[in-house]
Structure formats: C-alpha cells, structure tokens
C-alpha cells in the first residue's frame, strides 16, 4: 500500500475479518462510526473449495473453487494509527458491512494471473491496474496462507489492492470490476 516491497526480505501479512463484515454487491451501507477517512480498496477475491494445509505453490490451484470481485473498505485513519503503533489493524479493517463481495464465479483449479481491475467513484476512475501486478500472486498467497491455517471450503481471500485507494463520503456510489470475473457496486449511506 503505497510503498515498494522487496519480496526477498519481506513476508506477506494477513488480517482476518468477522462474518458480519460481508455484504453483497449492490448494497447501501452506513458510513461507519469512529472514522472520518473511510477508504475503498478494490480486490480480486478467491474462494477456497477444498481443504488444504501446507500446500505447495504447485498444488495451490487444487484448492481454488472460484473468484469474485471485492471491496475491502477500510477506516484508514484508525488503520494508520494502529500500524504506526505496531498494533493490530482490527478496528481499521474489521468493519460491519465493510467486505463487499460479488457472486462467486466457479473456476475450479484455474489460476487467474492477469485481468484488468478497476474502480470508479461517482463515475470517475480511481483505480485502474491489472491482477498481474499483485505483490504476491494467487499461488503464492494460497501456499503461504496455508502454512498458518488449515484452509477450508468457503474461505474467501481478498488478494490486495492496486494503487489509487481513496476516501469516500456519504452518498458516493462505487462501481468496481475484475475483468473476466465480476462487477460490484456499493452506495455509501449516511452515518447511523
């Protein structure tokens, strides 16, 4: 996110989200509490279809059920405070109705290696990139994550966002897409 990564010395890192963060594409969600800097992050989402633990990169495709387009909405102000203090990012990332997901497109065993990924806010392009620019590709993510957890059918893995993240306000309409996968939409409603 906004800085170069040397994969030879840095490891991928992950965070988890509670089930109540998941919301279907097309929803209107309230601007969340305790933030004044709510950001979009457009992502390719992969859906796990078979259990796996300590899976090699060569076997990673065997766990793939399919893909979706997703939005990882973030309380950026809270995330940055936590990051700078070396604390967990939970309050910045684990937001009710903050994980927007399209329908899952079944693509068993397929490894998506490229495809345009884009996001618009109120008709203006904010993110435009390609899946081939992911820091860690789909095979690497599955293999690495499976060294920490027993991956299970139904697990959704958001794979990271391209450059161009930014803030939204109540009333904004977000449309995102991953080429060959799906399109998603979200309207940001007023705060509760």
Curated annotation (Swiss-Prot):
Q: Which cysteines are joined by disulfide bonds?
A: none
Q: Which Pfam families match?
A: FAA_hydrolase
- Tell me the pathway: Aromatic compound metabolism; naphthalene degradation
Gene Ontology BP term (one): naphthalene catabolic process
Q: Does the keyword Phosphoprotein apply?
A: no
Q: Which GO terms describe its molecular function?
A: acetylpyruvate hydrolase activity; fumarylpyruvate hydrolase activity; hydrolase activity, acting on acid carbon-carbon bonds, in ketonic substances; metal ion binding
Q: What is its EC number?
A: 3.7.1.20
Q: Which keywords describe this protein according to UniProt?
A: Aromatic hydrocarbons catabolism, Hydrolase, Metal-binding, Plasmid, Pyruvate
Cofactors (names): Mg(2+); Mn(2+)
The Swiss-Prot or TrEMBL record describes its family as follows:
Belongs to the FAH family.
Q: What is this protein called?
A: Fumarylpyruvate hydrolase
């Amino acid at each position: 996110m906004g800085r170069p990564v040397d994969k030879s010395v840095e490891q991928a890192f992950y965070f988890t989200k509670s089930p109540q963060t998941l919301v279907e594409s097309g929803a209107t969600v309230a601007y969340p509490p305790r933030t004044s800097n709510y950001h979009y992050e457009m992502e390719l989402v992969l859906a796990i279809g078979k259990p796996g633990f300590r899976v090699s990169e060569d076997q990673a495709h065997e766990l793939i059920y399919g893909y979706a387009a997703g939005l990882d909405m973030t309380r950026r102000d809270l995330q940055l405070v936590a990051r700078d203090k070396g604390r967990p990012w939970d309050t910045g990332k684990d937001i009710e109705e903050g994980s927007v997901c399209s329908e899952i497109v079944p693509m068993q065993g397929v490894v998506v290696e490229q495809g345009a990924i884009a996001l618009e806010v109120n008709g203006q392009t904010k993110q435009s990139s390609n899946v081939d620019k992911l820091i860690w590709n789909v095979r690497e993510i599955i293999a690495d994550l499976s060294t920490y957890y027993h991956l299970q059918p139904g697990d959704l893995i958001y794979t990271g966002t391209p450059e161009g993240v930014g803030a939204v306000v109540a009333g904004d309409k977000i449309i995102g897409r991953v080429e060959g996968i799906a399109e998603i939409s979200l309207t940001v409603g007023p705060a509760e």
